[in-house]
Regions:
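Ligand-binding cleft/hinge of the Venus flytrap
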Residues: 45, 59-68, 146-164, 193-197, ...
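A ligand-binding cleft/hinge motif common to bilobed small-molecule-binding domains
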Residues: 79-82, 96-104, 149-152, 175-176, ...
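Periplasmic-binding protein-like
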Residues: 37, 113-121, 190-232, 250-255
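Extracytoplasmic small-molecule ligand-binding "clamshell" domains
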Residues: 26-95, 237
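Short helix-initiation/N-cap motifs at beta->coil->alpha
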Residues: 56, 72-82, 125, 162-176, ...
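Flexible hinge/capping segments at coil-to-helix
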Residues: 121-138
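Beta->alpha turn/N-cap motifs
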Residues: 35-39, 73-78, 87-99, 123, ...
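Alpha-to-beta junction loops
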Residues: 68-69, 85-94, 136-137, 166, ...
């Protein structure tokens, strides 16, 4: 064999070895996922202190389809976007509503859940709509969509709007009589109210439909595209419907 052929063969061998190494690294890449585990049934800790829920199953299904690994980190809602900004996590999945304000700072996947706001009140309450809460004490999660809704309707500095750091806290405040109503995303409010016979939910048709999205850093198109491809695939193969039925005990009829 000539020297030139030996060099060429050696070069091909090194290239192949390098390619296999890169492929292995890509396959082994682990993405860190922030989720606030106070948001049942989307994300919460089970009795074994594992973070489980609809959001967790969805991101796991996407990761499996797109051949990457994930590590879920329980992150308080108040610090969840800072964790993404600082590079402590690669993405956020935590029932985050896609809206124009957030789009200015972050990029989102396609919507993975259709939601709307829902009011929780005591069983004997006569509240039938958002407007009926005028002059009443309202609990919301700080910096949430419900906070935006209440602030627009009643004024951001209205002393009757009580802000808390998690959904369990607003429901606890309502159950204890500290407020007249709590507002939040329908999935989590309905779940919490179903566990307390003294409470009920109130639907207001004026609440628009919202979409939950997976959040990535602004400009991270590669990860955004990967998430969208995975989400489309789990919808197409039926995995999404199975996960939805597992957590909401009914067939998926939405988008």
């Amino acid at each position: 064999m000539s020297i030139s052929r030996r060099i060429a063969t050696l070069g091909l061998g090194l290239a192949a070895s390098f390619g296999v190494s890169l492929a292995a690294q890509a396959q082994a890449r682990e993405l860190t996922v922030a989720s606030s585990a106070t948001y049942a049934p989307f994300a919460f800790e089970n009795k074994d202190k594992q973070i489980v829920g609809f959001d967790i199953d969805i991101i796991n299904a996407i990761a499996k389809q797109q051949n990457f690994k994930i590590k879920v980190v329980n992150t308080p809602w108040s610090g969840i976007f800072a964790a993404l900004n600082n590079g402590d996590v690669d993405l956020v999945i935590s029932g985050v509503t896609i809206n124009d304000k957030r789009r200015q700072s972050y990029d989102f996947s396609a919507p993975y859940f259709a939601a709307h706001q829902l009011i929780a009140v005591a069983k004997g309450s006569t509240v039938a709509s958002l407007k009926d809460l005028t002059g009443k004490k309202i609990a919301v999660v700080n910096a949430s969509t419900a906070d935006d809704v209440a602030s627009r309707e009643f004024g951001k500095t209205n002393a009757n709007i009580r802000r808390f750091e998690s959904t369990p806290l607003i429901i606890s405040e309502l159950a204890g009589g500290g407020v007249d109503a709590a507002i939040g995303d329908n999935g989590v409010i309905a779940y919490r109210v179903s566990q307390n016979a003294a409470l009920k939910t109130v639907e207001d048709p004026s609440f628009p439909e919202e979409g939950f999205g997976i959040v990535v850093k602004k400009g991270d198109k590669a990860l955004q595209d990967k998430l969208n491809a995975g989400l489309a695939a789990v919808r197409a193969d039926g995995s999404y419907g199975e996960i939805y039925k597992k957590w909401f005990a009914k067939e998926y009829k939405g988008r």
